[in-house]
């Protein structure tokens, strides 16, 4: 089986790329980072350091790389059995052109083997969004053929992969946590789903997407925002602070109550899932910076993301949400000179004030009790 994976960064190499290579898939990475491409093509392998109770280093071999916008990438899409991505939500639209050109070539070449495309991104139904970007760019003459021969398969992914530590002289070395989860919507495949160990199939993807979004992502973000407020540097430092931990755990329990109501999750099992995530945040081998985890606050405060979506669920089911409100207020305080969204957030608050800013970003009702609560908590944090 041949696969092209867009995104040769740490998540691409340390998570999805590793699973594909471990399954003996003929794997090519696509990226725009030339030094990374050169290193992959020269060495054809890299090492993944897996850290937990025991640390081990595993080799990933027989890989190659092409530039994301190249004719080579287009040719690979025309011939591949699987295309995956780990590029970040905002980059999906940028790779849609290459994918569309590859699908046109595939049709013109007469390749009728099923092709499945899976976006492995930190977002809800990312592949469905990628599909819309691709179809917009696809000439009409090819649309029907693509719908018939190409599966766009949504997925939920979960693995903490921090940036490489400063001082590492190996551009390809990557560190990941032991835990990983890749769940895909088995109803969306074209043809039979490939047998890839570590890729789990489900016909109820949204339950798992929201479980991860409302627990791992909600908890991670609130840990980062409260951690920055308390002047902690890493996620581990922050979650070991009893005051931060109490709010983070409380917020995950509030969002968890929504999941239990909406999807019928078992309460005891979900409590264990929350505790597992807290222990992942404490991992002493992962030096995950609060500034990195908190970046892109405008996206994280939008209606469909990790802070507002669980809050809306608590309103829908008339459930408590005090800790989620604290997390939202802390997110509005997030500052980073390196993050354009953080700079934009600060400017919005300066010009509009916190209430109008929150309403504009989140879509919440300006006169709602939750907006008033969030603004009160925000002001108290000054």
From Swiss-Prot:
Q: Does the keyword Oxidoreductase apply?
A: yes
The answer to keyword Oxidoreductase applying to this record is yes
- Keyword annotations of the record: NAD, Oxidoreductase
GO biological process, any: mannitol catabolic process
Q: Which residues bind NAD(+)?
A: 3-14
Q: What class of enzyme is it?
A: oxidoreductase
Q: Name one GO cellular component term.
A: cytosol
Top-level taxonomic group: Bacteria
One Pfam family per UniProt: Mannitol_dh_C
Q: What is its EC number?
A: 1.1.1.17
The protein's GO terms of the molecular function aspect are: mannitol-1-phosphate 5-dehydrogenase activity
Q: Which InterPro entries match?
A: 6-PGluconate_DH-like_C_sf (IPR008927), 6PGD_dom2 (IPR013328), Mannitol_1_phos_5_DH (IPR023028), Mannitol_DH (IPR000669), Mannitol_DH_C (IPR013118), Mannitol_DH_CS (IPR023027), Mannitol_DH_N (IPR013131), NAD(P)-bd_dom_sf (IPR036291)
- Reactions catalysed: D-mannitol 1-phosphate + NAD(+) = beta-D-fructose 6-phosphate + NADH + H(+)
* Matches recorded under HAMAP family: Mannitol_dehydrog (MF_00196)
Protein family membership: Belongs to the mannitol dehydrogenase family.
Query: Which PANTHER family does the record associate with it?
Result: ALTRONATE OXIDOREDUCTASE-RELATED, MANNITOL-1-PHOSPHATE 5-DEHYDROGENASE
The protein here is known as Mannitol-1-phosphate 5-dehydrogenase
């Amino acid at each position: 089986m041949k696969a092209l994976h867009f995104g040769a960064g740490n998540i691409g190499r340390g998570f999805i790329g590793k699973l594909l290579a471990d399954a003996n898939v003929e794997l090519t990475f696509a990226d725009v980072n030339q030094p990374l491409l050169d290193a992959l093509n020269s060495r054809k392998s890299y090492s993944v350091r897996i850290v937990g109770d025991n640390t081990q280093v595993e080799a990933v071999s027989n890989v190659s790389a092409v530039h994301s916008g190249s004719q080579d990438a287009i040719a690979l899409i025309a011939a591949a059995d699987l295309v995956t991505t780990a590029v970040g939500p905002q980059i999906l639209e940028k790779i849609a052109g290459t994918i569309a050109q590859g699908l046109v070539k595939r049709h013109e070449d007469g390749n009728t083997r099923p092709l499945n495309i899976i976006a492995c991104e930190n977002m809800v139904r990312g592949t469905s969004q990628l599909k819309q970007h691709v179809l917009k760019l696809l000439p009409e003459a090819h649309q029907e053929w693509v719908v018939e021969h190409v599966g766009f398969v949504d997925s939920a992914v979960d693995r903490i992969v921090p940036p490489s530590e400063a001082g590492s002289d190996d551009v390809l070395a990557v560190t990941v946590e032991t835990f990983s989860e890749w769940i895909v919507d088995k109803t969306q495949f074209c043809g039979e789903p490939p047998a890839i160990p570590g890729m789990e199939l489900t016909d109820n993807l949204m339950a798992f997407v929201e479980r991860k979004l409302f627990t791992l992502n909600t908890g991670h973000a609130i840990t980062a925002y409260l951690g920055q407020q308390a002047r902690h540097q890493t996620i581990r430092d922050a979650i070991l602070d009893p005051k931060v931990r109490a709010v983070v755990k409380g917020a995950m329990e509030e969002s968890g109550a929504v999941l239990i109501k909406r999807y019928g999750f078992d309460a005891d099992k979900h409590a264990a899932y929350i505790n597992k995530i807290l222990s992942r945040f404490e991992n002493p081998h992962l030096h995950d910076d609060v500034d990195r985890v908190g970046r892109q606050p405008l996206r994280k405060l939008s209606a469909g993301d990790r802070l507002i979506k669980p809050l809306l669920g608590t309103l829908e089911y008339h459930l408590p949400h005090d800790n989620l409100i604290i997390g939202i207020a802390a997110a509005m305080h997030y500052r980073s000179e390196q993050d354009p969204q953080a700079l934009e957030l600060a400017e919005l608050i300066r010009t509009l004030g916190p209430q109008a800013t929150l309403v504009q970003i989140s879509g919440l009702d300006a006169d709602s009790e939750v907006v008033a609560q969030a603004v009160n908590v925000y002001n108290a944090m000054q």
